A protein has these predicted regions:
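Right-handed beta-helix
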Residues: 2-4, 10, 22, 69-76, ...
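Asp/Glu-centered strand-loop micro-motifs enriched in Gly/Pro and often flanked by an aromatic residue
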Residues: 8-14, 60-65
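Structural detector for short beta-strands of small beta-barrel domains
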Residues: 17-31
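Short aromatic-glycine-enriched beta-strand elements
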Residues: 32-40
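Catalytic cores of peptidoglycan-degrading enzymes
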Residues: 40-45, 51-55, 75-79
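A structural micro-motif recognizing beta-strand termini
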Residues: 40-42, 58-60, 119-120
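Beta-strand/loop nucleic-acid-binding surfaces
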Residues: 48-68
Length: 223
């Protein structure tokens, strides 16, 4: 049942509205900086665009200088309820897809995935598939972070193909398309052996001993 439009006449509280009602977001910048959202009521007909109210947004968490802050987009559809039915005290209790705005991902019967996707295409996805749980953080550009329980790996990947992988064997693999640079006051490597496929070049080499199958004479090459 639709509420009586006259309940909003003059903004008075002469009538009360119980239940939940659809509304359209018109403004998200509260002039009082209290987090309210300005909404209009399309079920009032053409007059609904002119009848607006500043509604408090129900959040998962709200406290002093902290909380869960995700505001709805202007012109998106939300659901509004009224405190004790008082029309001058509206609350936004949630947002809905209405057929015009599509879901970020089609629903599946297994219902394994939970996700948050933003306007720019940034995606945070939790996959609860049995034995293959996975968390993925991905940018539309292709940058990606994957925590994969099935593969027992953590992968950080740049859109250009550079990659850092930590796997279940305890290996850390770095793949770069160009150089890998380390800048620090000191770098300590603790390992019984360090292998290099190419040339090792340094300004100064201090060593306890050298074992080599060949020797190239040159400045500083004094044994």
């Amino acid at each position: 049942m639709r509420p009586d439009p006259d309940a909003f006449d003059g903004g008075t509280a002469s009538r009360r509205l119980f239940g939940l009602y659809p509304a359209l977001v018109k403004d998200i910048v509260d002039p009082d900086a209290t987090g309210r959202i300005k909404v209009a009521f399309p079920w009032l007909g053409e007059a609904g665009n002119d009848v607006t109210a500043w509604a408090r947004l129900v959040s998962l968490y709200a406290d002093d200088d902290q909380g869960w802050m995700i505001l709805p987009e202007v012109d998106s559809e939300v659901i509004v309820g009224f405190e004790a039915g008082a029309i001058e005290r509206p609350y936004i209790v949630g947002a809905v897809w209405n057929g015009k705005e599509a879901l970020p991902q089609s629903a599946e019967a297994a219902n394994n995935k939970r996700l948050l996707k933003t306007r720019s295409g940034t995606l945070l996805e939790f996959d609860d598939s049995e034995g293959a749980a996975k968390v993925t953080l991905q940018m539309q550009s292709g940058h990606k972070l994957v925590l994969d329980d099935a593969a027992q790996s953590v992968t950080l990947k740049h859109s250009n193909g550079c990659e850092l992988v930590m796997n279940t064997a305890g290996q850390v693999k770095i793949t770069a398309n160009s150089t890998v640079e380390i800048t620090a006051s000191a770098v300590n490597v603790h390992a019984p052996i360090v292998k290099c496929d190419g040339i090792v070049q340094c300004t100064t080499l201090i060593t306890q001993s050298v074992v080599s199958a060949s020797y190239t004479p040159g400045a500083g090459n004094v044994w």
